[in-house]
């Protein structure tokens, strides 16, 4: 069972839940940038939520299924067609052997996910198939995909899986925006509705002046072109510090908001480094990282502080949404 890459688009990689437990050795976790869309895709095709998928950035890939395959598309929606017939997102679909899936440019959002029954079965490295392009490990030879690549698919009884899906009438697109990840906290700023990223105070929040902390939660920030899978660099009112931005390097997690010497926030994403030497004013909660991962350069965001207990509650609520879909299968 396999998939052949005909056109990889700008950036398509194999990703899973990430390489956990090796930060002390300098290995980054990597994994899907939009963890919610990633998990939802897997549960739609009957996989374990941690199975490997394809992540496409800005524009999707063109792929040929070499065997009958159940698949699902989630994340940033783009025009998609299977053998020239339009197909929806957020629905289990059946591709026959030899069928070609073509994905266009995302209409909104940034990253799309293709999950297949059985999962992408490239060799795991340190317990994960996640591609780390900078380190050259995971995925397919530790690199982004190119035309002509062949990706193995894990063992799956496709006929039985599709029969179970159709018998339960699950082969229809999900319409609930909350379940599809389409509902995110927003804030009214003047005449605008802006994505609101919730955060807990960072380990060095005391390094910032009262005015600096106020500017952080009341300001508007624009995503700069310097955004990738590693981090989103923002531009807005410079945040005032009591002393310089540099600190003794310490640990970094997804969502860490470092502030560079120019006073601008940098929010860490999936490919973040393991340590950093800039003061961290906040940490974006895990439930809101999928929202950030789908924003494009030029879009604007704002922040608010929440308590750790509210952060845990939001994570549990988000997990319950995709678990609801899993329970139906």
Residue ranges and their predicted role:
Residues 1-329:
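Conserved "landmark" site that anchors the functional core of diverse proteins
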């Amino acid at each position: 069972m396999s998939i052949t890459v005909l056109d990889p688009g700008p950036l398509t990689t194999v990703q899973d839940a990430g390489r956990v437990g090796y930060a002390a050795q300098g290995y980054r976790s990597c994994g899907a940038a939009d963890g919610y869309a990633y998990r939802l895709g897997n549960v739609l095709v009957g996989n374990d939520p941690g199975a490997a998928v394809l992540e496409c950035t800005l524009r999707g890939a063109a792929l040929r299924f070499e065997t009958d395959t159940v698949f699902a598309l989630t994340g940033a929606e783009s025009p998609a067609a299977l053998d020239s017939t339009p197909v929806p997102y957020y629905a289990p679909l059946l591709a026959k052997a030899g069928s070609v899936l073509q994905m266009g440019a995302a209409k909104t959002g940034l990253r799309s996910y293709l999950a297949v029954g059985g999962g992408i079965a490239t060799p795991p490295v340190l317990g994960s198939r996640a591609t780390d392009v900078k380190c050259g490990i995971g995925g397919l030879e530790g690199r982004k995909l190119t035309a002509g690549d062949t990706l193995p698919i894990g063992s799956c009884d496709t006929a039985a899986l599709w029969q179970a899906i159709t018998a339960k009438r699950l082969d229809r697109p999900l319409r609930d925006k909350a379940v599809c990840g389409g509902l995110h906290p927003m804030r009214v700023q003047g005449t605008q509705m802006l994505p609101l990223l919730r955060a807990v105070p960072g380990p060095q929040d005391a390094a910032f002046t009262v005015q600096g902390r106020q500017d952080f939660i009341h300001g508007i920030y624009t995503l700069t072109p310097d955004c990738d899978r590693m981090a989103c660099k923002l531009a807005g009112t410079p945040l005032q510090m009591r002393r310089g931005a540099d600190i003794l390097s310490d640990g970094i997690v997804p969502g860490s908001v470092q502030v560079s010497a120019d006073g601008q926030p940098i929010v860490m994403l999936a490919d973040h480094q393991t340590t950093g030497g800039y003061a961290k004013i906040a940490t974006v909660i895990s439930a809101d990282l999928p929202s950030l991962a789908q924003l494009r350069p030029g879009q604007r965001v704002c922040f608010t502080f929440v308590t750790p207990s509210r952060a845990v509650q939001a994570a549990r609520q988000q997990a319950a949404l995709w678990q609801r879909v899993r329970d139906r299968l």
